[in-house]
Amino acid sequence: MTDTGTLFLSQQDVINAGATDVDWVGAVLEQVFVLHEQQAFTAPPSSFLKRPECPHVADRIIGLSAHVGAPFDREGMKWIASSHINPEHGLPRANAVIILNDPVHRLPIAILEGALISAMRTAVVQALAARYLARADSESVGLVGAGRIGALTVWALSKWFPSIQHYRAFDQSADRLAAFVEHMATLGVTVEAVSSFQEALAEADMGIVATTESEPYVTASEFKRGSLFMNVSLMDPTFDLINAADKIVVDDWHQSVHSDRVLARMHREGLVTRDSIHGEFGAVVSGHIPGREDPDERIFWNPFGLAIEDIAVASAVYDQALAQGLGKSLQLVDQEWDVLF
């Protein structure tokens, strides 16, 4: 019988395998978007578990499954749970587990701590998008939402954009914002804390929203001419901000409009169609459509977040872990179990 061992990788194992290396993760994700453009993947709609007594947009469990083609050729699922009250209790907003299966026998080859992979791929995707969609001479970044995703995104941008001179951040929690500024300083990134989201975004060459707000509030006034607006959040930008964009770029059109996020709401009201957006990011990465063409154009980047990103990064981490002898082997399946039947 084929070996049925399953490799368990803790968060530290995932780190040791390279998951916090921005350049390495970025190279994996660039391949992913090329595969997306080539349709070399299978990814059904995400499965959402939401309870009526927990109406906040960030209170849910999502199951995202996918098969990613060569050179990864792996399939699996990310099971990610989120509660918007967690930070108030000193807990991470989101936690996740990723299960990888081999594509032939469908046996579980790995169980990975998935929150770090999920957060890193989210952050590095923004830096990758900035490479193609932001001005190369961008000097300022404005962030709303001083959480882990915001911190990792700023850190990733600092690695790839030495031209950035100013980072400004706002958060509704003054304590969280102060802790964020202090933490970023330990990473070598100086961030100025500001007193409003308008102050953070209005003059930013790259504007980032990474919050759990459930209603739109950021207007076109905070979308500077020549800037890139990264909608990492769920609902922050208003319709008028999105309408002000010269280009709208999404990671996956179908997923983007079959959700309860702001772009999907606009689509349901007939305000955004497939023909009215510039295109999908994979087409930009593959060179099939241009990214930024004009230093003055405003580009709205709307990443839904794709299962193929998680599975590809997890697959690369798994391969590195095997090569380095990391993790713990588990025997989930008893080869003799069928004697009972």
Label every PLM stretch briefly.
Residues 1-119, 127, 137, 279, ...:
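N-terminal ligand-binding/catalytic initiation module
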Residues 13-18, 242-340:
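Adenosine-phosphate binding glycine-rich loop
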Residues 133-140, 163, 224-225:
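Short helix-loop-beta connector
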Residues 146-147:
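Glycine-rich Rossmann-fold phosphate-binding loop(s) that bind the pyrophosphate
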Residues 150-151:
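N-terminal Rossmann-fold NAD(P) dinucleotide-binding loop
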Residues 157:
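Aromatic pocket-lining residues of Rossmann-like dinucleotide-binding sites
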Residues 160-184:
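NAD(P)-binding Rossmann-fold cofactor-contacting core
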Residues 187-271:
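Rossmann-like adenosine-cofactor binding region
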